[in-house]
């Protein structure tokens, strides 16, 4: 029987800030770069999901490292959204605006590090009575962020889904809701494709 390489069928990746949780909480700007070097040196991985870095110089060094390592890069917005207690589907316009601005900053950071993908997520589920309204607001948020990203170049986006009723209590928890959003946004933005 011929052996088949997994690499022929998928990119094997690692979530950087989960493998190295100190990245999220460290005050040292070099922690991100130092820990990414460990991943880049491990030829098992062909992709890495990274989160935010406040230091633009570190982001540019990260980009250089990831380019020479030939790793596919996905930028995760969940540390920003969850850590900042932001809500992209907030019914309050000021609260939603804070989330939109943060997501636009995430897009800028994703371009800085050379990411091919950005992973977006919804905020808290407001409950049955306001869920449809919150979904509409979330789609508006996504359109605004995707339009913003188009100005900078080509970036692909995916939707990170969490649970609706156990821990994260996210608006977009069930897969069917994520698929509905992807179907609606895919023709114009290639979202989720």
Region locations from a protein language model:
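Short acidic/His/Gly/Ser-rich catalytic and metal-binding motifs that mark active-site loops
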Residues: 82-86, 120, 127
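Alpha-helical elements of Rossmann-like donor-binding domains used by nucleotide-donor carbohydrate transfer enzymes
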Residues: 34, 61, 105, 137, ...
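N-terminal pre-domain/capping segments
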Residues: 1-112, 185-189
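Charged helix-capping and loop-helix junction motifs
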Residues: 30, 134-140, 172-178
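An active-site-proximal structural segment forming one wall of the substrate-binding cleft
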Residues: 92-116, 131-152
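Surface-exposed cleft-lining segments at the edges of enzyme active sites
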Residues: 90-94, 123-136, 162-170
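Acidic/histidine-rich catalytic cores of soluble enzymes
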Residues: 48, 148-193
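Short beta-strand segments at enzyme active-site cores
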Residues: 49-50, 75-76, 115-122, 154-160
